[in-house]
Amino acid sequence: AFARVIDRLLESPHYGERWGRHWLDVARYSDGMGASQDSKPLPNAWRYRDWVVNAFNSDLPYDQFVKHQIAGDLLGEGHALATGFFAVGPTYTSDGGDPESKAQAEAETLADRVDTFSRAFLALTAACARCHDHKFDPITAADYYAIAGIFRNSKTRDIPVASEAERNVFTTIQAGIKAVSYTHLRAH
């Protein structure tokens, strides 16, 4: 009887929702931009949330779970959603006019990503190493900036969430609508 209850709970779609919520806290998931812009919606953030829930519900092995979140955009079509791990947290911005302000915003965003990565995947805090070595922390300032260098050389970009086939169908339909609209406008 106990085994049946466990199986029923593990097979429930609520399993992924429940355990995914813990991971989404680690990933600092938000439907908003975070930081001072939290009221500004973060489009498509829900897609990452749903990916996490589905990963738990489909019992995705942990090594793949991690690999997809770190390098899903390099693993082929269908895996890029997982890289939302790096996109759903705070993104700091400047007013765009002051180069120093822009550099500070980029540095804060980078620091947040390094700290989140180290907490999630290394189970270590790295924030102190941004400024100095600490005698009790295994991550040195050199280690911190080595990790930061990887993220600094990575670009955040918007990528299509639809497959190439879906985009082609959309383009074809849009062309048909445009042709009908143009014909209708010419007739009047």
Q: For each predicted feature, which ranges?
A:
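Short flanking/linker segments adjacent to small metal-binding domains or redox-active Cys/His motifs
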Residues: I177-S181
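Conserved small/polar residues in nucleotide/adenosyl-binding loops
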Residues: T183-H188
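Short, structured secondary-structure elements
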Residues: A1-S163
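Short Fe-S-cluster ligation motifs
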Residues: T156-G176
